[in-house]
Amino acid sequence: MISVNDFRTGLTIEVDGEIWRVLEFQHVKPGKGAAFVRSKLRNLRTGAIQERTFRAGEKVNRAQIDTRKMQYLYANGDLHVFMDMETYEQIELPAKQIEYELKFLKENMEVFIMMYQGETIGVELPNTVELKVVETEPGIKGDTASGGSKPAKLETGLVVQVPFFVNEGDTLIINTADGTYVSRA
């Protein structure tokens, strides 16, 4: 059991029989009434995001998540195939379960697969990934001083806002937490 006062980003908890990851949290102490913790949680089985409020000091179960290092191999229709790097065992995950993560996955990329009581519940991405720009408007000379941005489509289909100096074929570093441009690789 863990107190909601000890929440931190990335913590996995079990509430109402479901496994949740804490995305955001805020301790609120109103002038009148009891303190509470407002949180934004992601269901690791379904990918659904829910905002939930807990009373300060309330206890929840901490979910013990095991991780296995695996390599993303390929998509087979609606299923995505991963291989354990040590045992060469392959598992398949439905696209619906890893919908967000698919924006960042490339073939042969190493990731951690999250397991809860033997059940595969999701993919843990690295903090950043390198992705190649496949489509963007050409930068206009002299535009770099304005500090604006333009959309760029990456090799996985993800569209991000990038500075004007980024061109097709450039490799970019993308933050997987929010899908934003960090820098050129």
UniProtKB/Swiss-Prot annotation:
This protein's GO CC annotations: cytoplasm
GO molecular function: translation elongation factor activity
Primary localization class, coarse: cytoplasm
Subcellular location: Cytoplasm
InterPro entries according to UniProt: Elong-fact-P_C, NA-bd_OB-fold, Rib_uL2_dom2, Transl_elong_fac_P/YeiP, Transl_elong_KOW-like, Transl_elong_P/YeiP_cen, Transl_elong_P/YeiP_CS, Transl_elongation_fac_P
Keyword Protein biosynthesis: yes
One GO term (biological process): peptide biosynthetic process
SMART domains in the cross-refs: EFP, Elong-fact-P_C
Transmembrane segments annotated in the record for this chain: none
Pathway: Protein biosynthesis; polypeptide chain elongation
Signal sequence, start to end: none
Keywords annotated in UniProt: Cytoplasm, Elongation factor, Protein biosynthesis
Domain of life, per lineage: Bacteria
Family to which this protein belongs: Belongs to the elongation factor P family.
Role noted for this protein: Involved in peptide bond synthesis. Stimulates efficient translation and peptide-bond synthesis on native or reconstituted 70S ribosomes in vitro. Probably functions indirectly by altering the affinity of the ribosome for aminoacyl-tRNA, thus increasing their reactivity as acceptors for peptidyl transferase.
Official protein name in the record: Elongation factor P
